Amino acid sequence: MSEINKQWLGLPLNLLWGYLAIAVFMTGDGFELAFLSHYIKSLGFTPAEASFAFTLYGLAAALSAWISGVVAEIITPQKTMLIGFVLWCVFHVLFLVFGLGQANYALMLLFYGIRGLAYPLFLYAFIVVIIHNVRSDKSSSALGWYWAVYSVGIGVAGSYIPSFTIPHIGEMGTLWLALAFCLAGGV
């Protein structure tokens, strides 16, 4: 059996590290879902302002999701993932230091919005990697695994870990820890 055809319960073993990277990266990206809106309000912003930050992030992510496949086809999925990873890390730091750290709403929107453009470049370019490396008759299970590791990262670990970290290192410490997870997933 060739290396490209080896699977475990439909998981393409030749892409195992990519799947793990998605799970770890999305864990870090998902930390904020559990508390960021409340934290923004605790900085003195209104519920409407906190909601608008998430709306802007969602719009940026939707736009980036739309173009990520095209970009991956033009410059390769690996380069697209690298660009998304670097942008996410840089703009996460800027968001923490100058947006949240200074309670500057304009910079919060700018940096969080640009960060919203970044994660789909990293995340959805991996779908192109799957398509390029998995036989078409095996793609359904390979994509099922993709969505499973994505969901475990963002929805399970990313939402659960802050329940342990916030009492010990606070919201900002937890957001800095998110960077460590994304660095581990992106490298």
Features from the language model and the residues they span:
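Hydrophobic core of transmembrane alpha-helices in multi-pass small-molecule transporters
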Residues: 23, 105-121
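Helix-to-loop junctions at the C-terminal end of transmembrane segments
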Residues: 64-76, 166
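C-terminal ends and interior cores of transmembrane alpha-helices
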Residues: 86-102
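Symmetry-related core transmembrane helices of the 12-TM Major Facilitator Superfamily/SLC fold
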Residues: 173-187
